UniProtKB/Swiss-Prot annotation:
Residue ranges annotated for the FAD-binding FR-type domain, each copy included: 234-448
Chain segments annotated as transmembrane: none
Chain residues that bind FAD: 322, 356, 386-389, 404-406, 410, 419-422, 599
InterPro entries in UniProt: CysJ, CysJ-like_FAD-binding, CysJ_Proteobact, FAD-bd_FR_type, Flavdoxin-like, Flavodoxin/NO_synth, Flavoprot_Pyr_Nucl_cyt_Rdtase, Flavoprotein-like_sf
Family the entry assigns: Belongs to the NADPH-dependent sulphite reductase flavoprotein subunit CysJ family. In the N-terminal section; belongs to the flavodoxin family.
Cofactor info, note text: Binds 1 FAD per subunit. Binds 1 FMN per subunit.
GO MF term set: flavin adenine dinucleotide binding; FMN binding; sulfite reductase (NADPH) activity
First-level EC class: oxidoreductase
Name of the protein in its database record: Sulfite reductase [NADPH] flavoprotein alpha-component
Pathway note: Sulfur metabolism; hydrogen sulfide biosynthesis; hydrogen sulfide from sulfite (NADPH route): step 1/1
Organism of provenance: Escherichia coli O6:H1 (strain CFT073 / ATCC 700928 / UPEC)
Subunit and interaction comment: Alpha(8)-beta(8). The alpha component is a flavoprotein, the beta component is a hemoprotein.
Amino acid sequence: MTTQVPPSALLPLNPEQLARLQAATTDLTPTQLAWVSGYFWGVLNQQPAALAATPAPAAEMPGITIISASQTGNARRVAEALRDDLLAAKLNVKLVNAGDYKFKQIASEKLLIVVTSTQGEGEPPEEAVALHKFLFSKKAPKLENTAFAVFSLGDSSYEFFCQSGKDFDSKLAELGGERLLDRVDADVEYQAAASEWRARVVDALKSRAPVAAPSQSVATGAVNEIHTSPYSKDAPLAASLSVNQKITGRNSEKDVRHIEIDLGDSGLRYQPGDALGVWYQNDPALVKELVELLWLKGDEPVTVEGKTLPLNEALQWHFELTVNTANIVENYATLTRSETLLPLVGDKAKLQHYAATTPIVDMVRFSPAQLDAEALINLLRPLTPRLYSIASSQAEVENEVHVTVGVVRYDVEGRARAGGASSFLADRVEEEGEVRVFIEHNDNFRLPTNPETPVIMIGPGTGIAPFRAFMQQRAADEAPGKNWLFFGNPHFTEDFLYQVEWQRYVKEGVLTRIDLAWSRDQKEKIYVQDKLREQGAELWRWINDGAHIYVCGDANRMAKDVEQALLEVIAEFGGMDTEAADEFLSELRVERRYQRDVY
């Protein structure tokens, strides 16, 4: 691996030090280099005195701390942009991921900015769960000397819109913190709100924080950014689909696809635990149906991000058509004066239920009206990429990336409907067809750095995807650590995803144990959480041996049920009461021994 070295004048190392560094890292793999980068970042964080060559007295350097609490990457991008704005203003700033934040130091923060998303039913992002729990515990300190601001990202189609940000904002104030600015709650189309908020934060902090010397602002403004790539959410790679294979049986109620995408010579890199972002296009048939229901032609010009496009093209490429929201229902009702929908206006619960059960196209079908093209565009939300847990390791598949896609299919009064991204991959992209993708790195879902560490993987349904990547990596590394998989689905014969591969891993000794839960193969429904309780004694032995626990899948039901089962196992076999078991599991989370990728 070769790296272009910056001019020596820009380096903090002398030529001899640089030569030693290059010699020490010349034969390291990308994964090893990434680990070394994170290691030195940790060393740096533990030695604050080394951050500046000539540190000023603490009273002159209160500094600004930005905590990024991100689930899909959007909050992290906003936090990074704010960090860059503050550095440009020559302010002393530090950006830290919530999962890396030593939250007991929060009492010493003078200027604190929180950028957070929300997941599930109003829960904080995975990396912020421990911080959230600490702030809401009896251990939380008073924050009378802390001024703070919160930017909250969410999706108004969900009931608990921006709840995590609301929680942080109210709790920081309750603990005595002073609001620099009122909290901002941003919807899916958050960019404009974020840009305005960042400018206000910079203005507010200029009067609070001293301007730092360049060496100080650069040093303390550093952040653990080990991933560099020319491809991103806003500049995706045009890759090609090479395999689209249905991996559920013909009689299964589920349509699950194994998708392989060829990355070519792009150099795009990922690690087990990362997600693949997929930009999709809406079904042309769905676009045609919606346009005709509104008595439009499809060639009407509309403005999208400053460009003029035909309506059909705009709807296919730029707007969300397969997810309805309470706001869309309410706005459509108001625009059209629909006798069916107007009674729902003002009743949040009824609006959300209607949106959850009635796609946009069927809302228009059931409550027909005539809208002009611009009115339709203004009603809709921008199309956003979907994220899929990566189901492969480049140690085995090299220039490919695999994902496991559960295709969303359902009927509305006899008319077939489907999910936007899942049906795009399953039905509309031909072999070798183009798929625009990017990697969403997830450092909060990583294999242990020590290959001897045991691993417990809990992933029912398509939640099995990242564990396929984990096993490919552990096999390639010849990691001696034990591996235990818990998997569940409705039927053994129809829904055992990647069955042959798991059987091979068991035979080869890579997979030490596998416990399977088939919920519909017997009268009594059995789920993975039941298997956890059944194997409680052995599970506790693995935990005592230092095992790392990973959970992937549904956030609203499965993940909560699994966590409850883990708490029961810890309490019973660890001889703890409920409160102590909860504290024990929280400590595992802080130690990165309990990680979740839930959605």
